[in-house]
């Protein structure tokens, strides 16, 4: 037997290298085979419910890192709730209708207008479901637990029926109406868009300054006067029917020197406009308030059949332009509102493809709206005063990335204005984890217009509306519920397969159809109505979930998207918000803080991370960032997170190895019988348990990450485990000192594994497989550890906090001695302490082997005053010299008692007593040489 064999060196097959890319799929298959998700739900039956309702990602392509961050965050929350006494099922979902899928099929060569519509919809459905399957595997590969075999998908018959019923309730309450308001119109997708489908980009446009001649000045202006107008959308002049001024803005009547004409502009802008128009010298003839100009009549710049009325509008400012804007009610919301109030014609001169129509005039007909500027300039002639190119923020179609226009077309609307205050009142009842989120959603609802819910597309849920022979729209409870039942049985494609009369209840009559003839609506619903109905299609209809949901968690863009549409439909139907809490996340940016895009080549695919690092590293990264704001991710950042993971793993490996001979049922030492330092670590660990449990409850992942890493690095690695080897390796295998420390090791190991499970389930299960005395076969079926309190814990914490200060001072003294070449390692030191009474009392109170805690070979507490050469602090001073004696071959301490024993071992007296007591045969035979 060799002397080293008398050491209790930790033994374990738990590998240092995780091998996550290879092992994770193996674990995931084992969980699936064991039906772990279902078993967890069965365990929690009857407990308080917690419903995190999954916002559906769009089913198109593989998931990106933003999807991963969101789904991992949800998984951490659901897992932690499941392990905290809640019944917390998770039903993943997908959004499957809409233009992107139509675009994919178009790129694949499918010609929608040349094939049977039902066949086309079948292709859309098949493609959508193939993408659901693809993303399902992507999410499962992240280790996300949920009811993956029974997700919700917005194209299924049960979901579509639930959506129709949401619409029906809104129709019954009078919230659905048809109007010809201007809406965001995407010529590139030939459809109206909702606000949530708009994104803003910089656009360079031609802006024109031109003048309308006064036709009837109403006794205020002469007919040789011109009102100067500014526009950034020249094509809309073809539909201009008025000029809008600000009632309280001051305007001046001016005449430039050498110019026969007189002009009206905002007084505040005269100087800048004079420079722009080349007016070297201007005479101000008169000043008017805007309200004095009301109802003056001007000529259209070129259409002699059109008069343009001067009207008042609150939206006019003097921030730019001339303080006067032309008003085309068919091409803008503000224009429409003031135009309707003043009985102006709502003219629309651009078709659904962005092409100028016949009513724009023969010179314009057939041109694309963006290309008409030269024609407009030609038509304006000498009425054009200036033109310039400007860059401004402009709305784009979020899917096609093309600019959109405002365009008045007949559409179906949800009248948000009718129940706006109800929605605002409900927002006040919701808990927002970011106060700015509440303000943002509140202001969006407060300021938004009515919701355009119709779309001129085919791949979506049809609007369940019929038309009588006289054109009356029919959307009554009887017909809508009948459609819902048909969809429930056959799916929404039946709408396109059957004639209108076959979609109506048998025997249905209507006074507007004396001949019994009916037509059906051909528009579909906005996809935000699809996902915005999920509270009904899923949360209400799935018995395992509870409505309102406890939590909605999505990206911050969903304040204008899913948070918004869900809120509107839920309040419209039931008068309550669909969620009790909202937690929003920022966007994942690259390592430099730039937006990720394929064109820049700075994207990170979750699959690449899984191959290089493993999903665990991505999961740990999610907790390492403040996801309430935008976050950064790169392979370098993930490499740093991987190092943190390695530190966590190897710390826990040390605990596994050094409890391999510990049977908790037989070897646990009662708390009251622990050493003071062991009690301290037990209490500190329970502080960590409380911090992490509270942070899980508040969804504060970064708090968990910081607290866990700090505990492992500072409390364990830099302190407790730093001197642990002197106990667990050196002392007798069954000695009290070793069992005391193993008791703490095992307690921390088991509980920290449970605490890690929601974040690192693969690693936690791997650790759990080495804990043979734990009864649950999977750690995911266990509960998070409860927070314990202990007698005198505050007193113990105070004592050890003071000792840590003392230890820090001692380490500085040792470092100085090391720098002065007095010692090499700290075990070579003889440390002499010169304490005052406070420190002396402290060292007695810790009731421990202080030399062992400081990892020095010898420690003396001196009674005499410190010498001049001592390193002094306020309460204590230190001197360091090389310890006397020889190095013990067993414990490596320098000890005066170290000597060669009769059994061929050079060891100290302490090690000799351990060896002689525990290894009598080896002592009798003598140890082998090293």
UniProtKB/Swiss-Prot annotation:
User: Motif 'HIGH' region located where?
Assistant: 57-67
Keywords attached to this Swiss-Prot or TrEMBL record, sorted alphabetically, are: Aminoacyl-tRNA synthetase, ATP-binding, Cytoplasm, Ligase, Metal-binding, Nucleotide-binding, Protein biosynthesis, Zinc
* UniProt-annotated binding residues for L-isoleucyl-5'-AMP: 554
What's the record's note on cofactor binding?
Binds 1 zinc ion per subunit.
Q: Where is this motif: 'KMSKS' region?
A: 595-599
Quote the Pfam families the UniProt record gives.
Anticodon_1, tRNA-synt_1, zf-FPG_IleRS
Which cofactor is essential here?
Answer: Zn(2+)
- Alphabetized HAMAP family for the sequence: Ile_tRNA_synth_type1
Q: By its UniProt entry, which PANTHER family does this protein fall under?
A: ISOLEUCINE--TRNA LIGASE, MITOCHONDRIAL, SOLEUCYL-TRNA SYNTHETASE
Notes on the domains? IleRS has two distinct active sites: one for aminoacylation and one for editing. The misactivated valine is translocated from the active site to the editing site, which sterically excludes the correctly activated isoleucine. The single editing site contains two valyl binding pockets, one specific for each substrate (Val-AMP or Val-tRNA(Ile)).
Protein name, as recorded: Isoleucine--tRNA ligase
Native organism: Streptococcus pneumoniae serotype 19F (strain G54)
Gene symbol of the encoding locus? ileS
